[in-house]
Amino acid sequence: MSGTNRVAANLNMLFTNLPLLQRYGAAASAGFKLVEVSIPYTEPAEKLREAADEYHLKHTLINAPPGNWDDGFRGLASLKSAKKEFRKSLDTAIEYAKALGCCRVHVMAGIPKSDDDLENAHQTYSENVRFAAEKFKEHKLICLIEPINKYTIPGYHLNNYEDAMDVIQMDQSNNLKIQYDTFHAQQINGQIGAIMRKLKDYIGYIQVAQVPNRGACDTRGEIDYHFIFDEIRSINPSWVIGAEYLDAKPSFNWIENMSLSF
């Protein structure tokens, strides 16, 4: 279907009744040609690439290593105390992105907790993501940052679009973009379409899920996705849309019903 946005399956949140490597086959069987893997580091990069190649799937997005998830880390970029670990995480992200043939890497901000981290969070974050954008540019990778709402991840440093734009406008690499997730946008400020139009030149990737339960786009909730997808299509039909919602055994009728494509 020409002139329509394509949808990528998030393999960390969909098909969760299967091990990660088996989710590639499930995504392909559902019709997908694009996949995103937020946290690919539980498997060797070559195994993920083999699974993708077997089913003719292309990776559209990965996250940089976020720190120890089980210990409560949700990224490292705003943590002064984790500067060395953050820089090392970028090398790992580059290694995986290149192995997977993926051109986008999302750098998570993290949750500053110590007094020193809290006091220096914004400066640390700004310096770190601009460093990441420059470093990724050398490898032809796009650096993404994503505002996340305060209800889903309390204390997350980047929780609004104003701060995201402040950092982007200080970036000299022209390689720092917003990952615009409608699930978060609705809970940060609403006005999903209006904010998206305002930020259209700075958006590098879209993600979607229904609010409040983070379900599929055709489930009941706060967001009218027929309207939102019409808006996305009219603004930029080349944006890739990541289906980042929770569903162990999903159905994807909504993709065709809302005039999107695989």
From Swiss-Prot:
Residues in coiled coil: none
SUPFAM superfamilies: Xylose isomerase-like (SSF51658)
GO molecular function: hydroxypyruvate isomerase activity
Domain of life: Eukaryota
Entry keyword set: Isomerase
UniProt record, GO biological process: glyoxylate metabolic process
Reactions performed catalytically: 3-hydroxypyruvate = 2-hydroxy-3-oxopropanoate
Active site, renumbered: 146, 244
Top-tier EC class: isomerase
InterPro entries, alphabetized: HyI-like, Sugar_Epim/Isomerase, Xyl_isomerase-like_sf, Xyl_isomerase-like_TIM-brl
EC number(s) stated in the UniProt entry for this protein: 5.3.1.22
Family to which the UniProt record says this protein belongs: Belongs to the hyi family.
Purpose: Catalyzes the reversible isomerization between hydroxypyruvate and 2-hydroxy-3-oxopropanoate (also termed tartronate semialdehyde).
Protein name: Putative hydroxypyruvate isomerase
